[in-house]
Regions:
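Two-component histidine phosphotransfer core
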Residues: 1-148, 153
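C-terminal end segment of the histidine kinase catalytic
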Residues: 152-167
């Protein structure tokens, strides 16, 4: 219970401090998603797995705040999770300054209502930043989102500001 409350407080603190910020560092988002995932793991147990492979050279690159959380939440919302058929979520960096979030598709018996609000929100943030390259792909077996990572020096005089970890 103590570990759960600690993770819950980290998630809540991050949401309160960073929800208004437009951009966060990869380091900050990855730290947050680990705490968020720990909460999901408490609920879903062995029905959910997260694998992260983030190259440290991207730690100070930027991406829209809460993008990873929206994509992980999207994966959990739209897929069936069970111990026999676990949901696997991968988060990794790749050449060309990109962060990829990929999950296997396991359709729910009852489709969750969706207006694709999270995906539209991420797309809109990249458009506001005039940053091309956000992609979403669904091949029927995997759902993949590609997030362009932005070098801080290119963000000067942009409409959204960014946050470093404020914990």
């Amino acid at each position: 219970a103590e570990v759960f409350l600690n993770d819950l407080s980290k998630v809540y603190r991050y949401l309160l401090r960073n929800n208004e910020d437009g951009m966060s560092t990869v380091r900050t988002e990855v730290q947050f998603i680990q705490s968020y995932f720990d909460l999901l793991k408490t609920r879903h147990g062995d029905a959910l797995f997260l694998q992260m492979d983030i190259d440290k050279r991207y730690d100070d690159y930027l991406l829209p705040t809460l993008s990873l959380q929206m994509l992980v939440e999207n994966a959990v919302k739209h897929n069936a999770l069970s111990r026999n058929y676990p949901l696997h979520i991968e988060v990794f960096t790749t050449v060309g300054n990109k962060l990829v979030v990929n999950n296997n598709i396991q359709k729910r018996a009852q489709k969750a209502p969706s207006g694709e609000v999270g995906l539209k929100n991420i797309r809109m943030k990249y458009e506001l930043l005039n940053q091309p390259g956000f992609q979403v792909m669904n091949d029927g077996k995997n759902f993949t989102a590609v997030l362009p990572l932005i070098w801080e020096k290119t963000m000067r005089n942009r409409p959204l500001h960014y946050s470093e970890n404020k914990n």
